């Protein structure tokens, strides 16, 4: 059952079109929920790509994608096109950060401050 759900999600995301830099800039300048939603939806493939890099027997791909999506939404809220970065470059940091935080919290039996862990990863 879980694989069917994941496969349907992957198929649905594969149909989403990615935006070019011009479209990203115009959407981010609008600063409204509809524009942010379109920005997020057009970058869901990036989340899947990054999540697959962190997949292991201990980490379920669905969980990694879910956490990565949280990072993507956070990036959409904080993105400022005037800084000159592409959204995907900016978002990759937040996606990886959320995925790493999830893996750390899930797989550690001893609690180490997340800031200390981030220094080494």
What function would you assign to each model-found segment?
Residues 2-112, 116-121:
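Alpha-helical promoter-recognition and RNA polymerase-docking modules of transcription initiation factors
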């Amino acid at each position: 059952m879980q694989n069917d759900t994941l496969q349907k999600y992957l198929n649905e995301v594969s149909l989403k079109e990615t935006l070019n830099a011009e479209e990203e800039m115009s959407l981010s300048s609008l600063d409204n929920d509809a524009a942010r939603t379109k920005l997020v939806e057009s970058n869901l493939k990036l989340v899947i790509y990054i999540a697959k890099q962190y997949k292991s027997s201990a980490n379920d791909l669905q969980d990694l994608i879910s956490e990565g999506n949280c990072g993507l939404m956070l990036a959409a809220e904080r993105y400022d096109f005037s800084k000159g970065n592409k959204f995907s470059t900016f978002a990759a940091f937040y996606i990886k950060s959320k995925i790493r935080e999830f893996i750390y919290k899930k797989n550690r039996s001893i609690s180490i401050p997340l800031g200390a862990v981030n220094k080494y990863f």
